[in-house]
Amino acid sequence: IVADDASDYLGMAGKDKRPFFMYIAFNAPHDPRQAPKEYIDKYPLKRIELPKNFLPQYPYKDQIGNPHKLRDERLGPMPRTEHSVKVHRQEYYAIIEHLDAQVGRILDTLEKSGQADNTYIFFSADHGLAVGHHGLFGKQNLYEHSTRVPFIAVGPGIKAGAKNDAPIYLQDV
């Protein structure tokens, strides 16, 4: 629905020579992760690897006030099982790939509108998820997998392929 609405808007904006602004906020890959079955099927459980730092339980949960009763941590059994972590990772990979396909549809529509060469695009996320790292599933931690989110910028004057490791906050944009 989000990609359809965005594409419809771009179709209208492409007919108008005035600048436009569009903010798109997908729910994915947040819970509930609801990827179509054909995306889930691309990630058979037997091919899903556990994170190298997999633990059945987060060892510092009591010290940081992160009990098993926190919402994200109730999404799977405690202690963590290898199967539950693999299922969560399967769903996460599938919904990310589905999101990528939807973003691709929007970018295709932008290209067809004739506005792609004079449009700035910023892609980011609000946080990552543990999805089995350190015995955690959610975002209630300060590990890099939860705090180091993508930020991609494309547009006139932005050098393709440039990388910058400086910290950024979405409000900086």
Model-derived features: where do they sit?
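Active-site-proximal cap/lid insertion segments
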Residues: 1-170
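Catalytic core of tubulin tyrosine ligase-like
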Residues: 173
